[in-house]
């Protein structure tokens, strides 16, 4: 399509579209002018900037970079344009409002760059002035620091290896039949094994050691779980109560339960008999305030 140029106020950069738009049609407060008027305006602009104006046939063309979203309504369309110069006579115009912004940014960037350069120079001069006259940093200083860091790393590594070797030697010296010490392929440390052994030795159930209570439990409970014919009994609530009563009597006969506990296992409470169901305590009803 033939490039149709769009001219705005002379103080604002020109815009153009690759669209078939009628001449003198208002498009976002811009007017679509003929190429001849655009060439005249470009000649005036180049004359102000002391630049040779281009020939009419070599004017700049415009193309749409971003397609409009609504092609039927040009009053609601925002287009992003890009200018293509055939002859580099005039600088490409910027979009509306970007010329001043770019100049401001460039000015700020230049000032920031100058400030950073001056700060670097000051720091360099101050660092030089702080050093005493005739003093230079030895060339081997960096090498010495690197060597010292390497030595520190080696010592730490050697210490870790020694500690690991001691741990391996201690675990291998343990007996193979450690029982609960080895759990899923893991071997406990000697301190942990001693602590566990002490806890097992001091564990008591109703005043009896663990092994004594287990023997008493099996002696009392096992016969009650089987019928005389050798078939297992079907568990019921009555059977559980009988087992509990027999086990309690056996503990009392062994002297494992104190006399006070035999009279009242729970002080301050009335214990139901073996054949009695515990009665739930009824809570008093709260009187609602009217």
From Swiss-Prot:
Name of protein: Uncharacterized protein C22orf31
Alphabetical list of InterPro entries matching this protein: DUF4662
PANTHER family: CHROMOSOME 22 OPEN READING FRAME 31, CHROMOSOME 8 C22ORF31 HOMOLOG
Region of interest called Disordered, as start-end residue ranges on this chain: 105-156, 259-290
Biased composition (Polar residues): 114-130
Source species, domain of life: Eukaryota
Biased composition, class Basic and acidic residues, residue ranges: 143-156, 261-280
Classification of source organism: Eukaryota, Metazoa, Chordata, Craniata, Vertebrata
């Amino acid at each position: 399509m033939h490039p149709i140029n769009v001219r705005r106020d002379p103080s604002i950069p020109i815009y153009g579209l690759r669209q078939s738009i009628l001449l003198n049609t208002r498009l976002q407060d811009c007017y679509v002018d003929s190429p001849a008027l655009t060439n005249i305006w470009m000649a005036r602009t180049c004359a102000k900037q002391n630049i040779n104006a281009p020939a009419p046939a070599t004017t700049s063309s415009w193309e749409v970079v971003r397609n409009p979203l609504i092609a039927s309504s040009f009053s609601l369309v925002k287009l992003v344009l890009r200018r293509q110069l055939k002859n580099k006579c005039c600088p490409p115009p910027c979009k509306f409002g970007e010329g001043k912004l770019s100049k401001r940014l460039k000015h700020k960037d230049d000032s920031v760059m100058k400030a950073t350069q001056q700060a670097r120079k000051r720091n360099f001069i101050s660092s030089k002035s702080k050093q005493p006259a005739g003093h230079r940093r030895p060339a081997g200083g960096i090498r010495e620091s690197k060597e010292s860091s390497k030595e520190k790393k080696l010592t730490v590594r050697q210490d870790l290896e020694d500690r690991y070797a001691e741990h391996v030697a201690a675990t291998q010296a343990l007996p193979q039949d450690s029982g609960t010490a080895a759990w899923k392929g893991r071997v406990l440390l000697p301190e942990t094994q001693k602590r566990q052994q002490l806890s097992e030795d001091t564990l008591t159930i109703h005043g009896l050691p663990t092994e004594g209570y287990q023997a008493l439990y099996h002696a009392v409970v096992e016969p009650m779980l089987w019928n005389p014919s050798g078939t297992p009994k079907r568990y019921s609530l009555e059977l559980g109560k009988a087992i509990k009563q027999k086990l309690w009597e056996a503990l009392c006969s062994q002297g494992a339960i104190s006399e006070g506990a035999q009279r009242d296992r729970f002080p301050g409470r009335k214990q139901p008999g073996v054949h009695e169901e515990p009665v739930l305590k009824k809570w008093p009803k709260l009187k609602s305030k009217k």
